[in-house]
Amino acid sequence: MGYISLALVALLVFFASPVVLADDITPIPADRAQIPQWFMANVKPFSQRRGTLDPELEAAEASRRVIIVNQNGGGDFKTINAAIKSIPLANKNRVIIKLAPGIYHEKVTVDVGRPYVTLLGKPGAETNLTYAGTAAKYGTVESATLIVWATNFLAANLNIINTSPMPKPGTQGQALAMRINGDKAAFYNCRFYGFQDTLCDDRGNHFFKNCYIEGTYDFIFGRGASLYLTTQLHAVGDGLRVIAAHNRQSTTEQNGYSFVHCKVTGVGTGIYLGRAWMSHPKVVYSYTEMSSVVNPSGWQENRVRAHDKTVFYGEYMCTGPGSHKAKRVAHTQDIDNKEASQFLTLGYIKGSKWLLPPPAY
């Protein structure tokens, strides 16, 4: 009996302690109005998360450094690149780069040796990072205005823009706003502008909240394991337009895109929710409002018929005229509560060990 009592006590202590990963299992509410409360309860600031985060991240957050960038002077640096280069390789501290409002015409890379970087714009102000890189000049994934290789990156209140003009049909028109290749990255209130291949959500666990992503074809693509929450997906241009091209290539890969409480908008009609760029894409839309711009078939027909059996295209409790399923392609999955649950918690991106809210400006 003594052994059993100790076991019960241990369990009670575990479930009562702050180490419990409640933020990984509490589902995102179906009511959009409840999301702010849910977020505050499940993504608490560092001061309330000590002892629950990755040890390296805890050490970094405990020793923060702030850099001011103002292109008009009065800060530590006038360019974002200069601020990033001032961070030593093998950095172990959270470095918050506060950006004064303005237009920063730079092609920025956050190297793998510089983790724990935050790019922080001022809420309510216009802070634009712009560049006109193209695939013809740099190659597709290297054309991005912002490239992040480092882990534990965070950005908030930024507009990240590829200013290259809309490509003509049949040209090498890829021009990225961002490529995110680092694990454990979060984006809050960021806007991404481009046309073809706007956002390369490449590899790692990523979180997007209150963002806006605009493009034409495959404007979110890559191999990431990412949760998009309350984010607007806006298609522009005409002709063939596709939102998501996920690059999953086998059932063993633990990745995919989960869009929750998002809005699909755009101009014209016939926009596809996704396509099978590779053999095993995983893309799920939950509680998402789909306007009439969405193609009635939902998803682009697979060019390789064998992929009909390997794609995972899920829709769960979506709304709006574009969510009607009567004409969806046969391999669309109208998933049930149990199946949807895995895409509706922060556990999908293992958030309990690393996800933090944005810092104050």
From Swiss-Prot:
Primary location group: secreted
Pathway the protein takes part in: Glycan metabolism; pectin degradation; 2-dehydro-3-deoxy-D-gluconate from pectin: step 1/5
Known glycosylation sites: 128
Compartmental location: Secreted, Cell wall
SUPFAM superfamilies tied to this protein: Pectin lyase-like (SSF51126)
Site positions for Transition state stabilizer: 196
Active-site residues from the entry: 197, 218
Record-linked Pfam families: Pectinesterase
Chemical reaction(s) catalysed: [(1->4)-alpha-D-galacturonosyl methyl ester](n) + n H2O = [(1->4)-alpha-D-galacturonosyl](n) + n methanol + n H(+)
Swiss-Prot/TrEMBL GO biological process terms: cell wall modification; pectin catabolic process
This protein's UniProt keywords: Aspartyl esterase, Cell wall, Cell wall biogenesis/degradation, Glycoprotein, Hydrolase, Secreted, Signal
Tissue expression remark: Expressed in flower buds.
Signal sequence annotation: 1-22
One Gene Ontology MF term: pectinesterase activity
An example Gene Ontology CC term for this record: extracellular region
Enzyme class name: hydrolase
Positions contributing to substrate binding: 174, 275, 277
Enzyme Commission designation: 3.1.1.11
Stated family: Belongs to the pectinesterase family.
Purpose of the protein: Acts in the modification of cell walls via demethylesterification of cell wall pectin.
Protein name, per record: Probable pectinesterase 49
Originating species: Arabidopsis thaliana
